[in-house]
Amino acid sequence: MLNKTVNSKMKPKNSVEMKKLLLSALAIGALAFASCSDDDEPPIAEVVATCNDGIKNQGETEIDCGGPNCQPCTEATATCEDGIQNGDETGVDIGGSCAEIITVSGELTADTRWTADNIYVLAGKVVVGIGKTLTIDPGTIIKGKAGSGSLASALIVQRGSKIMAVGTPEKPIIFTSEEDNIGVGQTAGTNLDETARGKWGGLIVLGRATGSFKNDVTEVQIEGIPADDTFGLYGPGDALNDDDNSGELEYISIRHGGALIGEGNEINGLTLGSVGRGTKINHIEVVGNVDDGVEFFGGTVDASNLLVWAQGDDALDIDQAYSGTIDNALVVSDEASDHAFEIDGPEGSITGSFTLQNTTIVGSATAADGEYADYRSNAMGTTKNIYAIGFQSGKDVELDANDVAQNFLDGELTFEAWQVVGFNNSIFSEKVLKDEADNDLETTIILAPTFYGKSC
């Protein structure tokens, strides 16, 4: 493995010039044939392979390698500064043996940039320092080391810091496990699938926007971070800012996370604690996380274009009076999944209302739990334009407490335009009686036509 990536490249030959040369050679050959006697033979123009143009041509057996003129192909040792893709390189002079593996731990005390020609390995908690910005280039791969408890790896953007991680559709920024064999320039490895969970922690972003906390405190410790780590605090504290800006997350893939830090306490794929509406979050993918896919603890940030696949608990989770909008999401559950939505309301006197809209939820035919949604703890907000398919018979949308049912009756919890494929009756139910262990003892099906959308 190299200690650094050498960026020198051979300049590729201009394709237009090559075409002119070939046409000229053909024209000269034709003239010679017409003017010579039958005993003369036309000259043969020898065309040399272009070994650094990213095209398989002129005898090359692979792109820019093989044949009589280019370097050996994949069985050869990578040569990382010759302008040719060879050996185990995943691009020209990058990836494989040519990639620098940079291990990162502790606090980032200066503005930092991570680039796509390296692989970054999170060793434990990596925290963006207060007042500092972590910039991650499109196509960059970040891998988390295995570990649990205080050793669980995670990237934490604490209050007062920023992350600028803006990928593209062609070059997403990928957070994954160190076990993943994905390399520089690639978008997927070959050795892990969506059922590989808990291989590392996750991505945590914290801010100072509104949150509703028990006893009306103004800041609390985020789920997934031990209580003695002060960088895990979120909430306004003494500086409420609903427009708080924690940066940008766009075209991000988070895979194989959810490391355990305590009994029943795992890190979510993407955790957002009191994140403000000045932050941009869109095109986020979470695959194979032990706990929730994306969880919103308070805050005002909007999020759009979300995909959660094969989560071990809930796909989209709302808590502590989150009051932003989640728009255009897709949830694909598997046999380990619980709810597509788990929605909790305020814990203190501050209230807030969420909007969750334009979402498709795909259930699992084999999940032991696998419910549509659970609305709990005084939940308030609107869930609309939902398309649900693939859930087992008997699964439902739960109004899981009397205060939630009352919010529905009072118009503070609303449901609009749900289309549920496969059921002609309502899937919405109120849990009206529980035992001491919080198990459901009695359920009432709600058939009010204003409650549920068209079924088919």
Residue ranges of model-derived segments:
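Sec-dependent bacterial lipoprotein signal peptides
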Residues: 1-34
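Bacterial Sec-dependent N-terminal signal peptides
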Residues: 24-25, 29-54, 62, 70-81, ...
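Register-specific beta-strand positions within repetitive beta-rich fiber domains
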Residues: 54, 58, 83, 87, ...
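Surface-exposed interaction patches
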Residues: 60, 89, 254-257
